Swiss-Prot record:
One of its GO terms (molecular function) is alcohol dehydrogenase (NAD+) activity. An alcohol binds at residues 50, 70. It catalyses: a primary alcohol + NAD(+) = an aldehyde + NADH + H(+); a secondary alcohol + NAD(+) = a ketone + NADH + H(+). It is an enzyme of class 1 (oxidoreductase). InterPro entries: ADH-like_C, ADH-like_N, ADH_Zn_CS, GroES-like_sf, NAD(P)-bd_dom_sf. This is Alcohol dehydrogenase 2. It comes from Solanum lycopersicum. Binds 2 Zn(2+) ions per subunit. Zn(2+) 1 binds at residues 48, 50, 70, 178. It comes from the Eukaryota. NAD(+) binds at residues 50, 203-208, 227, 232, 273, 296-298, 323, 373. One of its GO terms (cellular component) is cytosol. Its cofactor is Zn(2+). Belongs to the zinc-containing alcohol dehydrogenase family.
Length: 380
């Protein structure tokens, strides 16, 4: 790889030229990394709902043409000025949010919301000089959440790159750079269920199942899955879910159903849908005195959370979380080690594998609600 250091690399990338239209495989030029940047060779990437959401461009600022993608794994090809903790050949996970290690958030043991590198979905350029590292015929192609992994090579700020165990299989651990870590950490780091406790998981997609996996790892004895789609229930058993509730089967609010099932409420709940009614139910279904509800899903911008203040006065706790409270550079390597030590199973999240040339099929699968994670193999 040393022959490419300092040179523009021409490679394949799946470019989103406009909202909702199939990605187009293009030859793009990828400039060398600048100060505090690294250029990565992406080996595996997967598709997350966030990619689809911004590809559809419903309700946010459309930024096109753009290279999407943010769940991935690869190898460092070269590093820019000032980069000291990464070197060519390192195995890494690029992450959509960062850890500069200098701001108040990064120095805090409680926060992972880096002031410098926190996710920015509107920015399509690099922080260093306000320019894109991607171009076609000299015209810029914009970045996505600082990662743009639907390209054979990409340039990322060093603070958004987690160096991992080189023995870890990149085609498995690539899913840890977004959704799976988000759900897992929501349980392990924020809800913190104790051994033998009860946990309700709202939404049994990939993030919700990762939250269930976290509850299972923590030793919860009852994990109640709540979803409007009963076809998800059988699969969820693999992730430790012991009981299921479909709100459509009841005439009363689901929080009342869960309270009756659990003698007053669950010890913990994790909400992964982003629907405001589910968020309220997730809070109101936890037990008074000690119950903790954790919100993961992102609601509609005009949604309003309404609950009676007595629900707080009766000592229920409501928390929110971002990326499972994991600091990308400090913590994600440890999550990879959980997988390597067989504490965490990733294979059951991976339901499809496709070659890079068929990336649009991955979008079709997600739009149909088929499967959890589709791994896209970049090599021919």
């Amino acid at each position: 790889m040393s022959t490419t250091v300092g040179q523009v690399i021409r490679c394949k990338a799946a470019v989103a030229w406009e909202a909702g239209k199939p990605l187009v495989m293009e030859e793009v030029d990828v400039a060398p990394p600048q100060k505090m940047e690294v250029r990565l060779k992406i080996l595996y990437t997967s598709l997350c709902h966030t990619d689809v959401y911004f590809w559809e461009a419903k309700g946010q600022n459309p930024v096109f043409p753009r290279i999407l993608g943010h769940e991935a794994a690869g190898i460092v090809e070269s590093v820019g000025e000032g980069v000291t903790d990464l070197a060519p050949g390192d195995h890494v996970l690029p992450v959509f949010t960062g850890e500069c290690k200098d701001c108040a958030h990064c120095k805090s043991e409680e926060s992972n919301m880096c002031s410098l590198l926190r996710i920015n979905t509107d920015r399509g350029v690099m922080l260093n000089d306000g320019k894109s590292r991607f171009s076609i015929n000299g015209n810029p192609i914009y970045h996505f959440v600082g990662t743009s992994t639907f390209s054979e090579y990409t340039v990322v700020h060093v603070g958004c790159v987690a160096k991992i165990n080189p023995l870890a299989p990149l085609d498995k651990v690539c899913v840890l750079s977004c959704g799976i870590s988000t759900g897992l950490g929501a349980s392990l780091n924020v809800a913190k269920p104790t051994k033998g406790s009860s946990v309700a998981i709202f939404g049994l997609g990939a993030v919700g199942l990762a939250a269930a996996e976290g509850a299972r790892i923590a030793g919860a004895s009852r994990i109640i899955g709540v979803d409007l789609n009963a076809s998800r229930f059988e699969q969820a058993k693999k992730f430790g879910v012991t009981e299921f509730v479909n709100p459509k089967d009841y005439s009363k609010p689901v929080q009342e159903v869960i309270a009756e099932m659990t003698d007053g409420g669950v010890d913990r709940s994790v909400e992964c849908t982003g629907h405001i009614d589910a968020m309220i139910s997730a809070f109101e279904c936890v037990h008074d005195g000690w119950g903790v509800a954790v919100l993961v899903g992102v609601p509609h911008k005009e949604a309003v959370f309404k609950t009676h203040p007595l629900n707080f006065l009766n000592e229920r706790t409501l928390k929110g979380t971002f990326f499972g409270n994991y600091k990308p550079r400090s913590d994600i390597p440890c999550v990879v080690e959980k997988y390597m030590n067989k504490e965490l199973e990733l294979e059951k999240f991976i339901t499809h594998t496709l070659p890079f040339a068929e990336i649009n099929k991955a979008f079709d699968l997600m739009l149909k609600g088929e499967g959890l994670r589709c791994i896209i193999t970049m090599a021919d």
